[in-house]
């Protein structure tokens, strides 16, 4: 197991191939802050929660780009996702070699996790 700590948006490439990439990037838009629970807002760093770019999928797209460059024969990418962007993220995956896409719901029935495999 290798862990990589980096500013993903500044990273140009990964130095090794990966079988599995797991990420929980920022995916909450700032306008959703008012509906967030206080226990999340009080204990999580805001830069870990809120995406402040025009494209809310910016982190996902960059990770997928890097994964494309460094994949193995059966690489998998796992993300926690914002349900409102699930369809857009699935469509983006289908434009890559990670075209076997599964979505899992959380305990409340919301689309929350996505797995993509390059099989």
Regions found by a protein language model. Name each.
Residues 1-118:
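S-adenosylmethionine
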């Amino acid at each position: 197991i290798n862990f990589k700590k980096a500013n993903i948006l500044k990273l140009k490439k990964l130095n090794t191939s990966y079988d599995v990439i797991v990420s929980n990037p920022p995916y909450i838009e700032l306008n959703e802050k008012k509906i967030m629970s206080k226990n999340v807002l009080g204990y999580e760093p805001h830069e870990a929660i809120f995406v402040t770019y025009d494209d809310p999928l910016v982190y996902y797209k960059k990770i997928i780009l890097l994964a494309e460059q460094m994949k193995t024969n059966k690489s998998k990418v796992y993300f926690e996702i914002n349900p409102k962007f699930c369809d857009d993220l699935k469509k983006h995956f289908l434009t890559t070699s990670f075209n076997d896409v599964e979505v899992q719901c959380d305990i409340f029935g919301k689309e929350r996790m996505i797995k993509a495999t390059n099989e």
